[in-house]
């Protein structure tokens, strides 16, 4: 069984990491159900294991080092953070590439509800949209596994202040931009979005 937790207040980043680390240990020991956690962070940057100082342009917000994959990304209001704590071993899916593909298909299917065509790129993890001939990222992935239990996850841009990305080179990809559902003309509440996330999740996971 997979539980869902929705946090309506901004969640401190360090608190979220400590929570996830405790939770995945419980899941591994069969002391807790799997969990999908939906939240928002206050404005901040996170540095994945591939992050370098070259990707920082200006320190507009606090920077948190984290053990997830990837480089620098931004988190803040108007962005739906999706942290997934799933036991891939119990699901007989001990395949990281398959997990990333499943995450991608999930978000692509969610975006279809809003007439947004999301795309998965093998060489650029995340979900991309073609906005007037320009490829822009609408959802960033940063995952980590411990004993085949996942944590960290997805940042989906609903209506964030996109200028906040200007302090970094997002995911180390300087030739590509970022976008949001709002920028693409879609206005949706997080509550509405969460309902679709749940609906589509159960079709893949």
Curated annotation (Swiss-Prot):
The record marks 137 as: Lowers pKa of active site Cys. Keywords: Acyltransferase, Cytoplasm, Transferase. One of its GO terms (cellular component) is cytoplasm. It is found in: Cytoplasm. The keyword Transferase applies. Residues 30-205 form the BPL/LPL catalytic domain. Its main location: cytoplasm. GO terms for molecular function: lipoyl(octanoyl) transferase activity. One of its GO terms (biological process) is protein modification process. Substrate binds at residues 68-75, 140-142, 153-155. It holds the Pfam family LplA-B_cat. The keyword Cytoplasm applies. Its EC number is 2.3.1.181. The active site is at residue 171. It catalyses: octanoyl-[ACP] + L-lysyl-[protein] = N(6)-octanoyl-L-lysyl-[protein] + holo-[ACP] + H(+). Pathway: Protein modification; protein lipoylation via endogenous pathway; protein N(6)-(lipoyl)lysine from octanoyl-[acyl-carrier-protein]: step 1/2. NCBIfam families: lipB, PRK14341.1. In the reaction, the free carboxyl group of octanoic acid is attached via an amide linkage to the epsilon-amino group of a specific lysine residue of lipoyl domains of lipoate-dependent enzymes. Catalyzes the transfer of endogenously produced octanoic acid from octanoyl-acyl-carrier-protein onto the lipoyl domains of lipoate-dependent enzymes. Lipoyl-ACP can also act as a substrate although octanoyl-ACP is likely to be the physiological substrate. Belongs to the LipB family. This is Octanoyltransferase. It comes from Wolbachia pipientis subsp. Culex pipiens (strain wPip). The gene is lipB.
